[in-house]
């Protein structure tokens, strides 16, 4: 039986996957409004996810003031980046194993999650 790596539950949810993917692509940070639009989340849902992720040092939220309205800028922390990339590596391993097992003539070994 082939062992499949465990997936970090912190990221294994559609909203958080979208959030972290967007934040990785915007290393200098992104406004709350732009992040909300990019991830197609409601204000309340995004706010809940961000506060949960900030509590475990995955994201950083800071207020930016200056010309115009103040904005909340969200960025992924170095720890968050490392953890998210580890999650993506584990997910890629699972995808490769499933693709290999699905090929014609593949052995009948079953995949097991840990």
List each language-model region with its residue ranges:
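Amphipathic alpha-helical dimerization/coiled-coil segments
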Residues: 1-4, 82-114
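N-terminal helix-turn-helix DNA-binding core of bacterial DNA-binding proteins
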Residues: 2, 6-45, 66-67, 71-75, ...
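A cross-family signal for key residues in well-ordered alpha-helices
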Residues: 18-21, 54, 85, 92
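Short, hydrophobic-biased segments on the C-terminal half of alpha helices
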Residues: 50-51
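Glycine-centered, phosphate/nucleic-acid-interacting loop/turn motifs that mediate DNA/RNA or nucleotide
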Residues: 57
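Short beta-strand "wing" residues that participate in macromolecule-binding interfaces
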Residues: 61
